[in-house]
């Protein structure tokens, strides 16, 4: 854990330096490159048992020729292409892990850069470290998709719709579940057409419908799809399992987040503040639905990545007491989920390269 805390501290320090030089593009980007490199280095230097999904697919993608066959790929295209790219110059698995994290953090920081006039890069990096970094060491394909989706949302806020479509396509080839990003496009459109109040009431209604119907229908549909070969067998492990404690913690955290951001939305009824609440309400509904299996828990993480971006925007120039309250909640979530529960099995950190 000390390694993570050290890296987080250094990253936040460089983010602070970048914040002070935000008007100087070259210096600003240089500091962000340092942050991306540092976090990617720690990810690449880790042992193969840090993160449960390494053994599930990452190691096999890199070392098994069958996974590298583009004509018969059994896994999402982007990570296969990345593995083939690494094989051009290295057979070291750590280089592959380094580039995966560089992709994740690179796109995340690019999204923050697109919105840098509306957010604090210090808050963005702080939230990323506390809410997403350890998860990115585990659910790598989804994290690659989620970071690209952050860029899609940034372009959506900038009303650059062709780029929105382009980044949605890239996210899809990282992980097919990224189609959930369409929900944010729909929510954004509804706000533009019907206003925040009506859309907010509709979101609450749909969240309630989701909670009531999901557990009844979803896992039955998953089982039917698996039995009829409509889903690959690799998804079977996501449809079962006991995620009760993890989901209960997520429900508590979502409720804690919703309270201050509802106050912000009431005082500042802006689109980005509404999208923050939208993501939190959907996270809360999915946290309840994920009491019975992992697949919903993983889908919920898309909203976590989105909130890293929107938290940073909503809290920009907000009262310090509100900002510190949200940061304390993020720290509490990190301690419970990562330090104590070790969700994703990224703690403790070990590296044969660094001899720790």
Model-derived segments and spans:
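Membrane-interface transmembrane helices that cradle and orient dolichyl/undecaprenyl
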Residues: 149-163
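Transmembrane-helix signature of polytopic, membrane-embedded enzymes
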Residues: 26, 112-129
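Short hydrophobic/aromatic helix or loop-helix immediately within or flanking a transmembrane segment
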Residues: 55-63, 69-91
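Membrane-interface alpha helices of multi-pass inner-membrane proteins
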Residues: 132, 163-187, 283-287
């Amino acid at each position: 854990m000390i390694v993570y805390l050290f890296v987080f501290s250094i990253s936040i320090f460089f983010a602070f330096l970048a914040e002070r030089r935000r008007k100087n593009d070259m210096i600003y980007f240089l500091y962000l490159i340092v942050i991306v490199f540092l976090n990617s280095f720690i990810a690449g230097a880790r042992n193969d048992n840090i993160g449960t999904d390494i053994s599930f697919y990452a190691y096999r993608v890199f070392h098994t020729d069958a996974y590298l066959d583009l004509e018969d790929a059994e896994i999402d295209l982007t990570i296969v292409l990345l593995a083939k790219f690494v094989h051009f110059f290295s057979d070291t698995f750590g280089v592959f892990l380094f580039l995966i994290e560089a992709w994740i953090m690179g796109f995340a920081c690019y999204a923050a850069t697109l919105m840098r006039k509306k957010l604090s890069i210090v808050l963005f990096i702080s939230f990323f470290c506390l809410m997403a970094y350890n998860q990115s060491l585990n659910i790598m394909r989804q994290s690659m998709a989620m970071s690209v989706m952050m860029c899609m949302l940034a372009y959506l806020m900038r009303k650059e719709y062709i780029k929105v479509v382009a980044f949605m396509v890239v996210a899809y080839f990282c992980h097919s579940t990224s189609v959930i990003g369409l929900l944010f496009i729909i929510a954004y459109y509804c706000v533009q057409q019907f206003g925040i109040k009506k859309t907010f009431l509709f979101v609450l209604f749909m969240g309630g419908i989701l909670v009531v119907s999901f557990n009844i229908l979803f896992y039955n549909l998953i089982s039917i799809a698996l039995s009829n070969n409509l889903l690959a067998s690799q998804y079977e492990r996501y449809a079962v399992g006991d995620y009760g404690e993890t989901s209960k913690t997520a429900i508590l955290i979502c409720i804690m987040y919703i309270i201050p951001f509802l106050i912000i939305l009431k005082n500042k009824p802006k689109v980005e503040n509404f999208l923050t609440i939208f993501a939190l309400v959907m996270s809360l509904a999915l946290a309840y639905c994920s009491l019975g299996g992992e697949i919903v828990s993983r889908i919920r993480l898309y909203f976590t990545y989105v909130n890293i971006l929107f938290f940073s925007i909503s809290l920009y120039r907000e009262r310090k007491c509100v900002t510190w309250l949200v940061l304390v909640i993020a720290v509490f979530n990190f301690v419970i989920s990562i330090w104590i529960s070790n969700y994703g099995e990224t703690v403790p950190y070990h590296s044969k390269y660094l001899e720790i």
